[in-house]
Amino acid sequence: LLFILSCKDKETAKKKEIEAFSTIPTLFTLLNQEESGFYFMNEVNQSEAFNIMTYEYFYNGGGVGIGDINNDGLPDIFMTGNTFGGRLYLNKGNLEFEQISGSANIFTRGFTTDVSFVDINDDGYQDIYLCKSMAGEIEYRENLLYINNQNNTFTNKAKEYGIADAGFSNQSVFFDNDNDYDNDGDLDLYVMNHRADFDNAHSIYDTK
């Protein structure tokens, strides 16, 4: 009899605890893609020639960049993609987004490993710098600098700015004015690259 009463007390206490939590206001609401217009899936398709054994960073995501590309006070989003570059989403307000990569002239191929929003030419508009990796062809491995044309379109000028790094990059950092590397008043950039050879991964793959 005592054991039964003990179980009942525990059930009552748990019920009260649940009821107490139910009175706490909800802090977050999950929006579906129909409501937000935001849909993104970073699909990574393996093959015999392209997998974790041939490229050790196969499953490494490149992250997310947030910046206001049209100065409307709303944060826009760039989602990086492993095998298709990434997508740019324009914030239209009221938690609604539009995928504008095509109309914005942002066309990327290959692995995108990092994204940075930065006003690199000091014109008051956010530009986008993308780190690239994996691809054997240099043209698909060069980092990209999309200069904001101030009309929701961009132009890649990485080579013009001398930062089309093709050294298997995986992260970039722009120094602010308080950390000016050479104190000349210009924006400096540090790009981190990983090893260009994957001999260890290949040796494991060859033994299977």
Language model regions located:
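Acidic, glycine/proline-rich Ca2+-coordinating loop motifs
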Residues: 7-208
